[in-house]
Amino acid sequence: MPLDGVKNIVLVLSGKGGVGKSSVTLQLALALSLQGKSVGILDIDLTGPSIPRIVGLEDAKITQTPRGWLPVSVHPPENTAQDGAPPRGALRCMSLGFLLRDRGDAVIWRGPKKTAMIRQFLSDVSWGPTDYLLVDTPPGTSDEHIALAEQLLTLASTDPAVASSMGRPRLAGAVLVTTPQAVATSDVRKEANFCVKTQIPALGVIENMSGYTCPCCGEVSNLFSSGGGKVMAEELGIRFLGTVPVDVKFGELVEGKMVVDSDSDEEDGPTQAQQPEEPVDNRPLVERYKDCWSYSRFEEFAKTLISQIESGSAAS
């Protein structure tokens, strides 16, 4: 059965490109995992799949089994809770990027082929037990979105009672991502209208790149405008989940540049040429993410979404 084992499906949408949908998707997935939830990421940005890169698994390959494709594991579950935190859930992901022969290959497909690929992603991937499947989408309301909505409304249900009685996943709703600027919010309003027309509940709005987090002290400075996402959410009657400043640490994390902090700041120490290479942090991605400034914000987003979805209070 398609999507067998998946409980809840959450779309991550934006009408504007470059607002950080993929980074928001990954951070939501990591935060949900740290709340003890088993999470999957489905990347349907077919012409620009970025999930393999930002999880550091560009060279991973998909395994074909009699049950379908097995998604790539980002990290396994961890049943040993620490400091009173819930046990860590597993995180798996699926992307066209894992199926390309070369990471630099261009995907030049017309609508019917894109539609067929999305249908295959939704029917032929063996996710296993998954509490939340996050779907990272391309910008706009293109062929991918239409195919996704049509297929999900067939395979899943937005009504939790119907989903439970029929043994289907619940299409819990969509998280809308924007930046504060009017040029972004105007396009995201169209995405909200797409949700209304397809009857997909809007779970909330995240205002990404709202300010800049100082990597030294953590203070947030509003270098550009802020608040546009909140105003838009209030006007549309959608829950405003919060703002996310630019986080240099998260950028270093997904670029694979995070190193173990050193206590040595002496000016008269060895020269740069003489200094040994700084030790690389080999902890799993999810554990390194907890050191990022943005983690605390996404932890709250994850808790809000869990409460909202599992209590059945998503707004239509």
Curated annotation (Swiss-Prot):
Domain of life: Eukaryota
Subcellular location: Cytoplasm
Residues involved in ATP binding: G15, K16, G17, G18, V19, G20, K21, S22
Matches recorded under CDD domains: Mrp_NBP35 (cd02037)
Subunit record text: Heterotetramer of 2 nbp35 and 2 cfd1 chains.
Protein's job: Component of the cytosolic iron-sulfur (Fe/S) protein assembly (CIA) machinery. Required for maturation of extramitochondrial Fe-S proteins. The nbp35-cfd1 heterotetramer forms a Fe-S scaffold complex, mediating the de novo assembly of an Fe-S cluster and its transfer to target apoproteins.
Protein name according to UniProt: Cytosolic Fe-S cluster assembly factor cfd1
UniProt source species: Aspergillus fumigatus (strain ATCC MYA-4609 / CBS 101355 / FGSC A1100 / Af293) (Neosartorya fumigata)
Lineage start: Eukaryota, Fungi, Dikarya, Ascomycota, Pezizomycotina
